[in-house]
Structures are given as C-alpha cells and as structure tokens.
Amino acid sequence: MEISKVRIQDIPEEERPRERLIRNGPESLSNSELLGVILRTGSNKENVVSLSSRIFSEYSIKQLSLANVSRLMKVHGVGKAKAAQIAAVFELARRLETFVEEPKRKVCSPKDVYTLMYPKMREQKKEKFITLCLDTKNQILKEEVVSIGSLNASIVHPREVFKSALMESSASVIMIHNHPSGDPSPSREDIMVTEKMVEGGKLLGIDVLDHIIIGEGRYVSLKDEGFVR
C-alpha cells in the first residue's frame, strides 16, 4: 500500500511525528514532520505525513513562509483552514524575530513596592494577597494573586504562596496585601501569616524579603517592624 494512503492511526505510535516530538523534542523532527504536527490531518486522498512532504517538495521553507493564504490554497489538499494554520505559524516566527523583551522592574525598598502596587490596590474592596517573585537582582519575575478575602493564617498556605516562586526559580519573594479600611496597621493574623511564610520559605530555600501592607496613601513594612527576620 502507498504510504500516502496509509491512515496516520495505522502508523505505529512511536513513528508518528507528534509522538516523536513529545518524546524526543521538536529538534528531532524534519521540516515536513513539523509541518505535519501543525496541520494535524491530511486530505481524503493522503495522510498528513504525505501531504506535508509534498508541500515541501513544491516549496522551500522560505517560499512557504512568504506565501499568503490564497497561494497556499492552490496546493492540492490544502484548504482554507490548513492555509491559515501555515500562515499563522510563520507570522509568529516573524514576530519572534522582532520581539524585544521589556526590562524587568527592580524593587530595592518597601517604598519601591508601594509605588508599584498602590495604584493597583487602592480601590480594592476586599483584601488581596499578592506575591512578587524576584530573581537574585531583585528584579520582578512574576506578580501572582494568591488569595482574595480576609487574610487568615489557617487558610493561606505556603504551597499557594510559593507555587509561582518555585516555577519561576525565584531567589526570593515579597508579599503584599491591602487593608480596604485604609489603615495599614498589621493585625495579629497578618503577623501570623508573615511568620508562617518566612519559615516556609526557609524550608524551600526562598527568602521572604518583606510583607508590605498597603492602606490609604501609606504602607507598613513588616520587615521594618521586625517581623521578617
């Protein structure tokens, strides 16, 4: 039987492009195999492996990247949906070439954190608990909302607080939450949560640099108050 007539599901699983990509990484696939993963299905007359190989026999990768949807649809077996998929992939590749990553924001003091977070938190009607995940230069890797509602030491768990920090390989975190009343004075619960997270961070090798409470036009740093050691 011609390979073009073989259904993709009849090809041994370990030989299918998608499964090989998952197992060995995308660099292990040829151009036509990568295209097959993108297209997913072939036509009524040929499977996706054969279709992708034929496309690359008619076009170089450069020509394919420059072809618009109308031109791609002239390839036998390529309809509007497949043409759009191909065009979208190459457009993403072009955008990657011109992508410039924004410089990471650096925080060096409680005032820096307050200046950054106050505009986002001043009109919140409920308490919002946020962590800033930082690298070794105190540059922000990620800002994560951990919980919304009254801060409670029995509810806020280190697992949620440090989840993003672990995923981002953060060196440290800063915790922030607001007091909708406008008074940033720490409650007993605030202090308990702080102490609990500081201990949790020590176990995980992630420093808790501070816990900052934001009120109306002012803030309190629990590090400055002596509760973060």
UniProtKB/Swiss-Prot annotation:
Gene Ontology MF term list: metal ion binding; metallopeptidase activity
One of the GO biological process terms: proteolysis
Binding positions (Zn(2+)): H177, H179, D190
PROSITE patterns recorded: MPN, UPF0758
Motif extent (JAMM motif): 177-190
Domain MPN: 106-228
Keywords per UniProt: Hydrolase, Metal-binding, Metalloprotease, Protease, Zinc
Pfam families with a match to the protein in the record: RadC (PF04002), UPF0758_N (PF20582)
InterPro entries in UniProt: MPN, RadC_JAB, UPF0758, UPF0758_CS, UPF0758_N
Family named by the database record: Belongs to the UPF0758 family.
Protein name: UPF0758 protein Mbar_A2303
Species of the source: Methanosarcina barkeri (strain Fusaro / DSM 804)
